[in-house]
A protein has these predicted regions:
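His/Asp/Glu-enriched, well-ordered alpha-helical/loop segment
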Residues: 45
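Short active-site oxyanion
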Residues: 31-35, 65-67, 104-108
Length: 133
């Protein structure tokens, strides 16, 4: 299962260096394993659309291909233990990913954030930074 962090989603939409490789990884994951993320992705991407002046419809189309997970009490509790090493929103993403991880469906975090990738790996999750490919 591929957990999509906002940093990678935005990289693919904003046409930044590495956007083509990132878009390819996202499309491959969508076709083979599926994409999952916290519903926080919606808020962060809408904010970026406003900040970067691009059409919110692009965000809506992108998010339509991602299974979104609610931020429940279990996510908040887990994220609270991660805020010493991560920013709050990254802690919510990592908490969500760790709660989804299981032996039958291991989670790999797709992120452009080195600190989040390291934190994911230290908790037994896979992590891919498309710019390292």
């Amino acid at each position: 299962m591929i957990y999509l962090d906002t940093s990678v989603a935005l990289l693919s939409l904003l046409g930044q260096p590495g956007a083509d490789e990132t878009a390819r990884l996202i499309m491959d994951a969508h076709a083979t394993e599926g994409l999952i993320s916290s519903c926080l992705l919606t808020v962060e991407m809408a904010r970026a659309a406003h900040r970067e002046h691009f059409d919110i419809c692009v965000v809506d189309e992108f998010i339509a291909g991602v299974e979104l997970v609610e931020i429940g009490p279990d996510v908040i509790e887990r994220a609270s233990t991660l805020t010493g090493e991560l920013k709050s929103l990254d802690a919510i993403h990592l908490a969500t990913a760790t709660l989804l991880d299981n032996p039958r469906h291991p989670v790999t975090v797709l992120t452009h954030d080195a600190r989040l990738a390291d934190a994911a790996r230290s908790r037994g999750l896979g992590a891919i930074n498309p710019l390292d490919s």
